From Swiss-Prot:
GO terms for molecular function: structural constituent of ribosome; tRNA binding. The keyword Repressor does not apply. It comes from the Bacteria. This is Small ribosomal subunit protein uS10. Involved in the binding of tRNA to the ribosomes. Belongs to the universal ribosomal protein uS10 family. Coiled coil: none annotated.
Length: 102
């Protein structure tokens, strides 16, 4: 298990939650003696939805909504069993999606 690389991808709609989560992951990994590369901010995906304001007429009157997905990438190098165990016990906010690949 020693010397293995772990890649952590985070996704969230709120940039404050994702920044807080990346800080916690980096601090936990450094505390256990692993080398951390990142967090690397990946491009933000922006989805725009346009809907009619009225249910029947007035095609010219529309409203736009947007949904931004923020992403971060963290590479954890030189891991050991303590690092993996500490990352598994880490409690992150509910609005953050975490993908871990080794």
């Amino acid at each position: 298990m020693a010397g293995q690389k772990i890649r952590v991808k985070l996704k969230a709609f709120d940039h404050r939650l994702i920044d807080q989560s990346t800080y916690e992951i980096v601090a936990t990994a450094k505390r256990t003696g692993a080398t951390v590369s990142g967090p690397i901010p990946l491009p933000t995906k922006k989805e725009i939805y346009t809907v009619l304001r009225s249910p029947h007429v007035n095609k010219k009157s529309r409203e736009q909504f947007e949904l931004k997905t923020h992403k971060r990438l963290i590479d954890i190098l030189d891991t050991n069993e303590d690092t993996v165990e500490a990352l598994m016990k880490l409690q992150l906010p509910a609005g953050v999606s975490v993908d871990i690949k080794s």
